[in-house]
C-alpha cells in the first residue's frame, strides 16, 4: 500500500467527518422530502422580507411538476434555470426533480453562449426572468427547440422593493409565456407520481465557465450532490434550522451545493438577496443572522470596502469560507482583523460537485513562503485527489 493509499491527512479530521461511508445513498429529492418532514411550516427561503416555508415549497413544486408533465415533459428531460438568486430558482429546481427531470443551471449573464448551451444540453424547458425572456432568451430558446417556457419576476415574494436592487427592474410579462408562480399556485399540492429517481441518476448538467473554449456540460448525479452537502454538514457541525446565507450565485456549483443543498440538508432557511450588492448583503447579514456563508474573495473585498461595513454585522457567522477564485492571505488577515472571523479556503470543480479540498474548521491554511500563496486545504473524505 502506498503512502497515498494510507491517506494520513484523514487523521486531521474528527470522527464524525471521517465516517463518509455512513452517508446514505439518496437523491436530492429524498433530502428535500426529509427536510419537509423535519421543518414543516418552518422557513425554507427568506428573500428580502418575504418567506416561503418548507411545506409551502413542497406544495408549490408539486404544482410546477404537474404543469411540466401536463405539457409533455418526460423523465430525463432537461430544464434550464436562467435566474438570479431568487426563490423561484429553488422552486424550479425541486419542481423539475419531482417531474423526473434534469436541471441545467445557467449564468443569467450569458448572452452569446446561451444558444450553444440550450442546443448542446438538449433543453426541453426553460425558466427565466420576464425581462430576460423579452430581451434575449425567447428568440434563442425558439432556435434551440425549447418547447416549454415559464417566466418569473424578481419583484415577487420580496417586500423590500430596495432601490439598490430594483431601481431599474419593471414587470415585463410576455403574453404567451405563463408565470412560474401562477402555474405553481393553481396546481399547488397536486398528487404527483413517483418520478423514480435513483442516487445514480443525473441531477444537474452544470456548464463550466468556458476558459478552455466553449462552455462544456458536466454531469452531477444526485449522489454526488447529496454526499457533498452531507459532508459539508458533518464538516461544519451546524445545528438544524440555522440560516445559511447565499453569497455565491445558485447557478454556480458552489452556490448549489454549499448553500442551497446544504440548507435543505439542515432543514434550514436559505437567505437570498437577488444579486450581490454590498450594502444589501451587509444589511441582510445583520437582519437574518446566518451562521454560514461562502463566496469568492472579490465579494469579501467589496464588503470590506463598503462605507457601511462593520464587524458586528458578521457576529452571527460561525463559519466563513471562500472558493471560486484565489484567496490572498492579506484578505484573510484583514477580514479577521475587522470581524474576528477567519476565512477558510477551499477548492473544487464543477465536475466534482463543488468542494473536494477544504481547510478544516480547527486549522488555518499555511502560506507558502516562496510564492506567498495560501494553501487550499486537505482533501475531503469523499474525494480522491492526485497531483500529476
What does each model-found stretch correspond to?
Residues 170-207, 214, 237-243:
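Conserved pre-ATP/AMP-binding loop-to-beta segment of ANL
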Residues 80-82, 89, 93, 97-135, ...:
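Short beta-strand->loop structural element characteristic of the AMP-binding/adenylate-forming
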Residues 226-243, 251-292, 306:
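Conserved AMP-binding/adenylation subdomain of ANL enzymes
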Residues 70-71, 102-183:
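Structural core segment of the AMP-binding/adenylate-forming
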Residues 4-11, 29-53:
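AMP-dependent adenylate-forming
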Residues 290-294, 304-370, 384:
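Gly/Ser/Thr-rich phosphate-binding loop
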